[in-house]
Amino acid sequence: MSETQKENPYSSTVLLPKTDFPMKADLAKREPEQIRSWKQNRIFRKMREQRSGKKEFVLHDGPPYANGNFHLGHALNKILKDTIIKSKSLAGFYADMIPGWDCHGLPIEVQVLKNLGKKVRETGPEELRQLCRKYAEEFVGKQGDDLSRFLCFWDEGRIYKTMSPDFEAKIVEVFGELFKKGYVYRGKKPVYWSIDLATAHAEAEIEYYPHISPSIYVKFPIIGEKKRFCLIWTTTPWTLPANLAICFNRKIEYSIFKTESSEELILADALAENVTITTGVALTKLKPITSEELAALKFQHPFVDRISVSLFGDHVTLEAGTGCVHTAPGHGQDDYKVGLAAGLEPFSPVDDYGRYTDEFPLMQGKKVFDANPEIIQLLRDKGLLLYHGELEHSYPHSWRSKKPLIFRATPQWFFKIDFQDLREKSLSAIDGVRWIPSWGITRIRSMVETRPDWCLSRQRNWGVPIPAFTCESCGQTHIDDASIQFFTKMVREKGIEIWYSEETKDLLPPKTKCGKCGNDSFKKGNDILDVWFDSGVSNFSVLGERKDEPPADLYLEGSDQHRGWFQSSLWPSMALRGIPPYKAVLTHGYVLDEKGRAMSKSLGNGIDPTADIIQVYGADILRLWVSSLDFRDDIKVGKESLKIVSEQYRKIRNTFRYLLGNLDGHTPEQNLPFEELEELDRFYLSKLAGFVEDAVASYETYQFHQIYQKLILFCTVTLSQDYFDMIRDRMYCDLRDSKSRRSSSTALQYILDSLCILVAPILSFTAEEVWTSNGKKDSVFLQTFPDLKSWKNQSLEDKFESALQAREVVQKALEIARQEGKLGKSLEAALEIVSKSGLSFGELLPKETLELLFVVSQIHEENPGMEVLSSHENEKFSVKVLKPLQGECPRCWRHTEDISKEGDLCGRCKSVVA
């Protein structure tokens, strides 16, 4: 016999919780085994098969670059998507998401070139493409492993890669459809250009950083006037060799001003004072000059033997400068537009690597940024530099090289944004999309309203070639529907390598001739498609078509994708379908360190989701952290926040452990019908029903942080602090098969099952672990959210809540007695409770229920002559803690009125042990 049994011979008769479910989760070690089980049993496929024919919910996965391991931002994104898919499936939907990877483009090509090091010169284009494909394939595998380790569900044989032949063929096909409909054209326009990478950049590939530029005021001599000049201001001296005009605004008032050196300068009246303050040159107004007079002016280029003309444009403002704008149509969007209207061809004497060409022989071969000081000195030597300073401003940089970009006019392929009112149609369609958070619509509208034509072409090796040919006889570009369809079929069979491996004649339909001269000899183009076009047409390649509605129910990405993937997906879909590709768009913020700084290698503040979280805490802790966030805003994370989440997880796990322990020996077949349950149990099942309803609603609106908060409250307060405490005596000391104990066991079973299913989208491993620990054979993910609305009983809740209002007063009174050393356990107390409203507690709940509610041995509305140990009251209740006249039952520790002498069992315990 144990020491405990010697001390208390009844301990073996008490039904204490018993379970093999460990308190220590050991998630990092045990989760991989569960991942293997899910894969072997094809749980994700079974989830979909089980929901076949149900209402469909499709989340389209924006493809990450197959470049490097997943960082914490990726983990946030993928876990959010997985949580949504699981919650939608449990809500009864046929929920689906096919994970994808972006495999072409600069990020991969640049990394491969970097890895080659000195061998780069020995590597030809064909070998480079093979290395890029191999590199992308490697990281698809690594990131796929990361995805599984985040406990995300996906079928490994059911993914999309933008470098697969089928996908590449779809890219070419969609490009062809857009070309056929007139949305694609070739033209020479200024585009963002990386002189480090020698390629064009789209709007989505640009990042803005602080940059210091020269700030100069330059005098353009007026033809026919000896001492009269037009004053311009620029921060890009290197573009002056390409100047073809000076632009004014007809709505701005201009005048001729005289300097102390008797020179005359034309500039805007409203900016004269600013010019004087900046340059230190005093200006005296001589006379106004009209728009007609300005239009007649011609200007001598400051250092090139060329005449510049006068133009007018609304882009000229009074925000800075002189109101007279240096205009180089080959190096600026606005410059290009006004130049085009005036018949000026864009002129850009700069090559792919940012060096001046022989069109500016004075500095041929010089890099443009390096030329700035020389151009400034040239102006100074000619007496045409009024002022030279510096300006720090936000300047466009390449997202890949982090180096400044230039605007440069080159022949490129473009998507025509304003063709057939596409911009207006898209703006109208945006209004019909659900944007979460709501400010997303304002952000994307502002971008769509001002977006220039999309530059589709790139001058790189790794990507889908634009199927355009050049006639070797007359130089005409050849591209038509027949040639695109022919090439699409070839790509579908053999991949894009066919473009490089086959002879040009074999890439075109037989008997293809030049539409201009009739020649049949062509050469291939060298441009590839923007990688944003690849991902932008993924909804055509991956998703099934739906009649008159978008193919995706939801897009979910970081808020930076308003200018990226959300737009690159929108334009082709609007052009070809007439509708957006998505019904709703949900965005999340950036992951920052605990000080609100971006994570970077230089700061050393990065948190690796695998090494720093999963291998330390487990993936369920990572998922719980994600669920705790209001992710619509930027998110701060550090060791302290992860520690807090880990502690909250322990409380949730402890709740599950207590439930499982108390259900030892209980089977669902022993559950009582709901209507036969005790009132206390029905009250807490009503509370459960309310919690479930709220949680399901929060899943529906993607407000997972609300579920997290309510789950913690439900587990720690509603259950652990209240309900478990109230039924402990019943569960431990009642007869195992008594109706009272079965009532509570039934409630605990319902609570366990409901909580388990409810948290499964978030705590995927733990939910499955609890589910199987309770003897369930199938997966928790093959269930549906419980519908407990019929259990919701407001009148019952009102009745209990009235009684529970006294619990705070009771607990305070008990605490006073403990502090004074008069009381140990609450079961050593009896209570006198008086409602100041005159309401009798007996009218609300039976005395036995109140004793459970307050976890005391006896309840009295009037003291039957017991010693008062303490008292407390508020405006509603007065409570006295009494010392029971009876002794303590050695089995249940209660002091009940049926105990006749010290050491006797109470009547209930006598019947149990008999």
UniProtKB/Swiss-Prot annotation:
Q: Where is this motif: 'HIGH' region?
A: 64-74
Query: Motif 'KMSKS' region: residue span?
Result: 598-602
| Keywords of this entry | Aminoacyl-tRNA synthetase, ATP-binding, Cytoplasm, Ligase, Metal-binding, Nucleotide-binding, Protein biosynthesis, Zinc
Q: Which residues form a coiled coil?
A: none
Q: Which residues does UniProt assign to the signal peptide?
A: none
Its annotated compartments are: Cytoplasm
* Ligand binding (Zn(2+)): C889, C892, C906, C909
UniProt keyword Iron-sulfur, yes or no: no
The record, for Pfam families, names: Anticodon_1, tRNA-synt_1, zf-FPG_IleRS
Question: What is the protein's name according to its record?
Answer: Isoleucine--tRNA ligase
Q: Name one GO biological process term.
A: isoleucyl-tRNA aminoacylation
Q: List the disulfide bonds.
A: none
Q: Which residues bind ATP?
A: K601
What's the record's remark on domains?
Answer: IleRS has two distinct active sites: one for aminoacylation and one for editing. The misactivated valine is translocated from the active site to the editing site, which sterically excludes the correctly activated isoleucine. The single editing site contains two valyl binding pockets, one specific for each substrate (Val-AMP or Val-tRNA(Ile)).
Which reactions does this protein catalyse? Answer: tRNA(Ile) + L-isoleucine + ATP = L-isoleucyl-tRNA(Ile) + AMP + diphosphate
Listed CDD domains: Anticodon_Ia_Ile_BEm, IleRS_core
> What is its quaternary makeup?
Monomer.
By its UniProt entry, which HAMAP family does this protein fall under?
Ile_tRNA_synth_type1
